UniProtKB/Swiss-Prot annotation:
Belongs to the TRAFAC class translation factor GTPase superfamily. Classic translation factor GTPase family. IF-2 subfamily. Its main location: cytoplasm. GTP binds at residues 199-206, 245-249, 299-302. This is Translation initiation factor IF-2. Residues 299-302 are annotated as: G4. InterPro entries: EF-G-like_DII (IPR053905), IF2_II (IPR044145), IF2_N (IPR006847), P-loop_NTPase (IPR027417), Small_GTP-bd (IPR005225), T_Tr_GTP-bd_dom (IPR000795), TF_IF2_bacterial-like (IPR000178), TIF_IF2 (IPR015760). Residues 62-103 are annotated as: Disordered. Pfam families: EF-G_D2, GTP_EFTU, IF-2, IF2_N. It is found in: Cytoplasm.
Length: 688
């Protein structure tokens, strides 16, 4: 008899891999994971266990008995309630008469937010004049309708020997805070896994998505017509898998930045002939930051230069070790263009789903996340929603982000009109008053009026929040957040000009340990700071450290928009010193660098006794005569110094604005080339 893997035996005997692994542990047989090989002796023992087991009562019988018990309980409760009603009323009336005679001081009072003097007096069973007198003795002049803060309320109540408890009231407008609360275990049912495909450019992400869709979705459909709604479902072995049709990092970054966790499993596509590339590393960082299981699909196995062993070797550096080498990462060789290995990949997704046990409660109002949204001339606002919990029905009042409405129509991923959508189901809906953003959370309600009120309140709150935007984690307020126990771990993204600098800086930063707060480096890379780095920092509340590199124009704009702290340095020990001082609360810089503009070198002229004159075009901001400058070539800083001359035509000028040409010479530097970026900056005093 040949050896067999755990998951193969489980499949053969119609049991889950997880149950089988539990059974093996009960039999004192150790297995590391579902890919472990089982010896013949173990297989025989398992056969005996499963063949001789006592018959269990059917699920239908259990359900019937349980239903009878529940019904009998409900009936008994009704009887009790009928008998109690009049008795309770009599007791209440008697208590009311007693209260007019004797007023007892309570042992404990509760409040939320604040109380007026009159409200506090009522809760303490005292006269308002008595409370006003006590406040006067404490040096507080107050009237009966004046609001009192938490400290004053506690001070007065303590004086009477009464305990005070503040109630934290969660507004319905902030439904995100309680929509992810766990349901009771008995209400949870198995749901399909939600999968995102990530990887480097041209490694076959889109081809893989198309290959899965064409082989599974269109089979058996009338005319084979599918509708692109940003997500689709496939059926494998009578089980469904939901794929987000957004290859790349969008499904992770923009959604995670808004607090939405959509993906259950990540498929990391790596070309067998190309190996690990920069965006592959970026994808790994995103998946790990989100805490999502990774399955590696080694693509392009049909190519002559394919070398899967090299891919495995390179990925071990990022803690993705194949099961064949003693790790726990699943590697599946595929050829997306020829459709080879697709079935095996889908089976592995089902296997991970089975082990992870993804569940949801279908018997409640729907909650979930927006995948895509747009404005259509004929239909109005269209939004693709992923139902994550509950069941969404046509006609349900719904709040999506700051918009609201009623679900007028729902269309599935295959273009069919549907009336209901359960957990992990993507649907396209119409009926919202505004276009929401990808990553916005949604919740269905029982009452349309209530949904409208909550939607309008959320829109108003978002407007107020936008005016007083709260910044992300920054070095200036780091110590305060540590003191308030808000920060136990500091997330950093490190970018440098060469790999050696990245490794040296990462190693030095990891050694910092102040006040029990650890440094966690969530991503490292070589080259300029990109928009993708800023979005990852925003989603993970991280600080970006740049060593000898600069952010590009898009990254700079996104950093300002997302309030991400970007720190740029040219000396390693200063980076370490700055982080350490910030963690100790000693960081107190007097000046802050402010980049005021960038100019691109379009042409160079060499003039005797003058040096190199750069004919430039100002592409962003402005260049001023008294600003410091740095020369950036291919995203790397190669020189830093001062302007020597700044001219428009033949005239010396104080500044040149955006979209104008100028002539620039730089002190003690003549090696200017076409395509170089001259970045101008000034040092501004920072108020503390």
């Amino acid at each position: 008899m040949s050896k067999i893997r755990v998951h193969e035996y489980a499949k053969k005997n119609n049991i889950s891999s997880k149950d089988l692994m539990t059974k093996l542990k009960e039999m004192n047989i150790e297995v590391s994971n579902h890919m472990t090989m089982l010896e013949d002796e173990v297989v025989n023992k398992l056969d005996n266990e499963y063949n001789t087991g006592a018959e269990k009562p059917s699920v239908a019988d259990e359900f019937e008995v349980e239903e009878k018990v529940v019904r009998s309980k409900k009936n008994s409760n009704k009887k009790k309630k009928k008998g109690k009603g009049n008795e309770d009323k009599r007791q209440d009336n008697f208590a009311g008469r007693q209260q007019t005679q004797i007023v007892e001081t309570p042992d404990k009072i509760t409040f939320s937010g604040s109380l007026t003097v009159g409200e506090l007096a009522k809760k303490l069973s005292k006269e308002p004049s008595e409370i006003i007198k006590k406040l006067f003795m404490l040096g507080i002049m107050a009237t009966i309708n004046q609001d009192l803060d938490k400290d004053t309320i506690e001070l007065i109540a303590t004086d009477y020997g009464i305990e005070v408890e503040e109630e934290i009231v969660v507004s319905e407008t902030e439904f995100e805070t309680f929509m992810d609360e766990q349901d009771d275990e008995e209400n949870l049912k198995e749901r399909p896994a939600v999968v995102t495909i990530m990887g480097h450019v041209d490694h076959g992400k889109t081809t893989l998505l198309d290959s899965i869709r064409n082989s599974k979705v269109t089979a058996g459909e009338a005319g084979g017509i599918t509708q692109h709604i940003g997500a689709y479902q496939v059926e494998v072995n009578d089980k469904k898998i939901t794929f987000l049709d957004t290859p790349g990092h969008a499904a992770f970054t923009t959604m995670r930045a808004r607090g939405a966790q959509v993906t259950d499993i990540t498929i990391l596509v790596v070309a067998a002939d190309d190996g690990v590339m920069p965006q592959t590393v970026e994808a790994i960082s995103h998946a790990k930051a989100a805490g999502v299981p990774i399955i590696v699909a080694v693509n392009k196995m049909d190519k002559p230069a394919a070398n899967p062993d090299r891919v495995m070797q390179e990925l071990t550096e990022y803690e993705l070790v194949p099961e064949a080498w003693g790790g726990d990462t699943i590697f599946v060789p595929i050829s997306a263009i020829q459709g080879e290995g697709i079935d095996n990949l889908l089976e592995m997704i089902l296997l991970v789903s089975e082990v992870e046990e993804y569940k949801a409660n279908p018997n409640r109002y729907a909650t979930g996340t927006v995948i895509e949204a747009q404005l259509d001339k004929g239909k109005g606002t269209i939004a693709t929603l992923l139902v994550q919990n509950g069941t969404l029905r046509v006609g349900d009042p719904i709040v999506v982000g700051t918009s609201f409405g009623r679900v007028r129509a729902m269309v599935s991923d295959i273009g069919r009109r549907v009336k209901v959508a359960g957990p992990s189901t993507p649907v396209e809906i119409t009926g919202l008053n505004e276009v929401p953003q990808a990553g916005d959370r949604f919740m269905a309600f029982a009452d349309e009026k209530k949904a409208r009120q909550i939607g309008e309140s959320r829109a108003q709150e978002a407007l107020v929040a936008q005016r007083g935007e709260k910044s992300k984690l920054s070095l200036e307020d780091l110590f305060q957040q540590i003191q308030e126990s808000d920060v136990k771990e500091i997330n950093l993204i490190v970018k440098a000009d060469v790999q050696g600098s990245v490794e040296a800086m990462a190693a030095s930063l990891r050694k910092i340990d102040v006040e029990g707060v650890k440094v966690k480096i969530i991503h490292t890379g070589v080259g300029a700071i990109t928009e993708s780095d800023i979005i990852l920092a925003s989603a993970s509340n991280a600080i970006v450290i740049g060593f000898n590199v600069r952010p590009d124009v898009n990254a700079k704009r996104t950093a300002e928009l997302e309030n991400v702290d970007v720190r740029l340095h040219r000396i390693i020990y200063k980076v370490i010193e700055e982080i350490e001082l910030a963690m100790q609360g000693m960081l107190d810089p007097e000046f802050e660098e402010k980049v005021i503009g960038q100019a691109e070198v379009r042409q160079t002229f060499k003039v005797t006794k003058v040096g190199t004159i750069a004919g430039c075009y100002v592409i962003d901001g402005k260049i001023t005569r008294d600003s410091g400058v740095r020369i950036i070539r291919d995203g790397i800083v190669i020189f830093e110094g001062q302007l020597d001359t700044l001219k428009r035509f033949k005239d010396d000028v104080k500044e040149v604005a955006q979209n104008y040409e100028c002539g620039i010479t730089i002190e003690r530097y003549n090696d200017l080339k076409e395509g170089d970026i001259i970045e101008a900056y000034v040092m501004e005093e920072v108020k503390r």
